[in-house]
Amino acid sequence: MNKNTFAKHPPMGWNSYDYYDTTVNEAQVRKNAEYMAEHLKEYGWEYIVVDIQWYAHGAGSQRDRFQYIPFSGLETDEFSRLQPDPERFPTSVGGKGFA
C-alpha cells in the first residue's frame, strides 16, 4: 500500500450538529442533503450525519436550562434500537426509520 495514495481526501460530508445542534428536523436534513447532492457530490462530498438527540422528544426545547435534555422520552423498536423522534422526523412513523 502506498502511503501517498491511501486516502486522497478525508471523509467529506455534512453533520447536523454543526449548525442545528440538537434541534434538527427532517425538512432541514432533506434540504441540506439535496443541496449537497446537487452541488458538492462531484467534489467528493458523500456523507450525511444526523447527530445527537435525533431520537429525543423535545430536543433543544429547553435551551435556557440545558443543551441536552436528560432523560427525554425515547422510542425503540422490538430490538431496542432507537427510533427517530416522530415529531421532528414524520416519515419515520411506524418504524420506517430515516426515509
Predicted regions and their residues:
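Extracytoplasmic/periplasmic, Sec-exported soluble proteins
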Residues: D21-Q28, P90-G94
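Aromatic-lined carbohydrate-binding/catalytic grooves of carbohydrate-active enzymes
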Residues: N32, M36-A99
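Mature N-terminal, pre-catalytic/accessory segment of carbohydrate-active enzymes
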Residues: M1-E26
